[in-house]
């Protein structure tokens, strides 16, 4: 069979397969890119998971107890203790954290 004969016979199938491959690649890139949206915060001296919950739970739309449970599970904290200098992943999307940390200054001030 020549290429022209194959194309004439199966062009709909070939276009369908190519479209599926392109859409699959786009979907995979989207899913892979969205996996790292959670924020990572530096633990300061005297901080605890509950202190982080006080500070960030409202931004994550979670109750404080749920926030603490999520942080312990995702960061493999069996005893629930963190020490200064540790980095902890919290269930707050980076965009929410950046938006709330920035300040807006009025032009006349």
UniProtKB/Swiss-Prot annotation:
Subcellular localization(s) per the UniProt record: Cytoplasm
Transcription listed as a keyword: no
Record has Cytoplasm as a keyword: yes
GO CC, any one term: cytoplasm
Protein's job: Inhibits cell division during the SOS response. Affects a later stage of the cell division protein assembly, after the assembly of the Z ring, by probably suppressing recruitment of FtsL and/or DivIC to the division machinery.
Family: Belongs to the YneA family.
Name by which UniProt lists this protein: Cell division suppressor protein YneA
Natural source organism: Listeria innocua serovar 6a (strain ATCC BAA-680 / CLIP 11262)
